[in-house]
A protein has these predicted regions:
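Non-catalytic accessory regions flanking glycosidase/transglycosidase catalytic cores in CAZymes
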Residues: 2, 21-237, 242-250, 272-273, ...
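Active-site His/acidic residue clusters
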Residues: 254-268
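Hydrophobic h-region of N-terminal signal peptides that target proteins for export
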Residues: 11-22
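Bacterial N-terminal signal peptides that target proteins for export
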Residues: 1-10
Length: 481
């Protein structure tokens, strides 16, 4: 019965994706409904992830026994809302007390996840300092692979209890940090459904353990939010939600995509949309409500290359705008040197193409997602299970009621030609001056991309804009509402 139930859910979701974008002529009609607000966009969907993997931290963020401040400055340029650490697979073997206290006294440990020596010179206090420097929320993933609920609860004590409240709170003070860190977000392990993980287990066992971990951690600090391990298997998610559901606040999903063909790569955000919708349907079916939100806390291409990776990232953000009622956290994996937004190597420190996508959405997106209908030409993707009709033009729109600012994000996946869009704003009569920004490069493989201001545009109830090939366009204007 359970499998039949999920088969029906998948059929409905899959059918809705197939039918949303029928093949049409070259002109794309975009309809934005100012009165149909999907929901509030949680800024944590523009989040990041760093792990003790390759040169993400050591040789990237951390240089010798201090920060690489050029990397820190680039991170600041993203205005990051949230950052996940220490893993990833690394988290399943990490014992947090190895990474506190005087750096010279910390033990070197051999990391079984990535088969490398970790000097432990970057630990909890350094992570919190990084978050403070770049003004973002810390999100810590505890060790449920080889760790215990007691160890996790002690970590919450170290981070969140006031001086004098416990041994671990006083240990933080001893290490030079009088005030509690106030870490709000705590992950309950990482990918424990996979046999590549230390502590790999079945859904039932994980759910029982997650319930106990979350209870112990919340008894230390009831204000924290915990994120359980989810995946693209409805049966795993069902078990976790049924057993641990009352004790958790989020369930996670990790999605990576890889394909040599450009059009399949940039179609993959719609496969992610399908998976996220399926998880949202599972949450509703298992709990009868939407209290538990989704943390899409690892996503990326396995081989992010050039402008194509930026087109992919913009597609993900348009999906997250559409699913803002369900997805409240999302973290690209990873921030520095590993499938990165920032590269730090012998050539210096520099951003990759997707870096500018994050900047554009973070800087310009308003707090409310609007319903957008897109009617235009599409192509068929067959790489991600079944067939998905992929629109060449993909649009999301946001509204800031405090300033009456409308922002339209227009993604053109077509790598060959520009596409004309007729944009109609429903339930509005007026005229406004807007500003246009365009992210583009010479071709989809190019790493040399830039954001250009394309000048002014007059926004009317119906207006036209031609989206250049392989581009992301942002149109922003204050409407007289």
């Amino acid at each position: 019965m359970l499998r039949q139930f999920y088969a029906k859910i998948l059929l409905v979701i899959f059918s809705s994706i197939l039918l949303s974008f029928a093949e049409k002529g070259d002109e794309t009609k975009v309809r934005i409904d100012l009165t149909n607000i999907i929901g509030e966009i949680n800024p944590n969907i523009y989040g990041h992830f760093i792990e003790h993997l390759d040169k993400c931290i050591y040789g990237g963020i951390w240089k010798g026994n201090d920060f690489n401040y050029k990397v820190v400055d680039l991170i600041k340029g993203l205005n990051p809302p949230i950052m996940r650490w220490p893993g990833g697979n690394f988290a399943s073997g990490y014992h947090w007390m190895d990474g506190i206290g005087p750096i010279e006294n910390r033990p070197k440990k051999y990391d079984l996840a990535w088969h490398a020596t970790d000097p432990n010179t970057f630990g909890t206090d350094e992570f919190i300092k990084l978050c403070r420097m770049v003004n973002c929320e810390p999100y810590i993933c505890v060790n449920m692979g080889s760790g215990t609920a007691e160890e996790a609860a002690n970590w919450v004590e170290y981070c969140n209890l006031p001086a004098g409240a416990s041994y671990y709170a006083d240990l933080r003070v001893k290490n030079g940090h009088e005030q509690p860190y106030g870490v709000k977000y705590w992950g309950l392990g990482n990918e424990l459904y996979g046999d590549w993980q230390i502590g790999h287990t079945d859904a039932h066992t994980y759910a029982l353990n997650a319930r106990e971990f979350s209870k112990r951690m919340k008894w230390v600090d009831p204000s924290i939010k915990t994120i359980a391990v989810g995946c693209d298997d409805p049966q795993w998610n069902w078990e976790v939600l049924m057993i641990a559901g009352p004790h958790i606040d989020y369930i996670s999903l990790h999605e990576y995509y890889d394909h040599p063909d450009y059009y399949e790569r940039v179609a993959s955000p719609l496969a992610a949309e399908r998976s996220l919708k399926r998880l949202a349907a599972t949450i509703l079916a298992a709990t009868g409500e939407n209290r538990i939100k989704i943390a899409f806390d690892e996503w990326n291409l396995w081989r992010p290359q050039g402008l194509a990776s930026a087109i992919f990232s913009a597609g993900i953000f348009n999906v997250l705008h559409r699913l803002c009622q369900n997805v409240h956290i999302a973290c690209l994996a990873q921030l520095v040197n590993v499938l990165p937004l920032i590269i730090a190597d012998e050539k210096g420190e520099r951003p990759t193409p997707s870096y500018f996508v994050f900047q554009l959405y973070r800087q310009h997106a308003g707090p409310l997602a609007l319903k957008v209908d897109v009617d235009g030409e599409s192509y068929t993707s067959r790489a991600w299970g079944g067939e998905i009709q992929v629109p060449f033009i993909d649009v999301s729109a946001t509204l800031d009621k405090s300033s009456n600012k409308l922002t339209i994000f227009i993604l053109n996946r077509d790598k060959e030609k520009s596409r004309e869009c007729e944009i109609k704003i429903r339930d509005w009569q007026g005229k406004a001056e807007g500003q246009v920004w365009e992210l583009n490069g010479k071709d989809v493989e190019s790493d040399e991309v830039e954001v250009k201001e394309r000048g002014k545009i007059i926004i009317t109830p119906t207006f036209k804009y031609t989206a250049p090939a392989h581009s992301l366009t942002v149109i922003e204007g204050k409407l007289n509402l």
